[in-house]
Amino acid sequence: TVSYEYDSMHRMTSSTNAKGGVTQFAYDERGNQTSVTDPSGYTWISSYDLANQLIGRTDPEGKATKYTYNLAGRLLSRTKPGERTAAVTYDKNYNVISLTDPKGYVYSYTYDKDNRQTEGKDPLKQSVKTAYDPGSCVTAVTDKMGLMEQYEYDPHGNIIQRTDTKGLHTRFQYDILDNLTSVTDPM
């Protein structure tokens, strides 16, 4: 049996596992979880800015991870001890246009006028491209090897056929309520 306790604000304050181990949770006056102490007594501490965004987390060994955000509240960076900073950049519509991982590898993304991701490139500049119909349904995905998978839809937006990179078709059928009723795999 696992049991839970809550405070007057309906926030979990403790959980007791089947072996009797208790994990405790603490919160600040704004409801942000500020600490978690596991059954072994190890504590993780979290801190927040005035916008209630997580800006730091310290593990039981005292190693602190830091987070930064832009004015719109979107994550800009995460810095862990002993690692490079992982970073995110956005376009004017807040689409992610690049991710830099802790190893320094950069992934980039492009979007169409409707803010749909049309291409993603890995650190080696190998890309995956995505095409859409006017209703924003994905019609094709071309992988980094240039192989294309295609999709067809009914007027309700239900996928009715998927053509894989080998040209094999998987067909989908729906009832009048748009519930999937059958899938026919390629033979």
Residue positions per predicted region:
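Beta-strand elements of repeat-based all-beta scaffolds
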Residues: 1-17, 21-38, 42-59, 63-80, ...
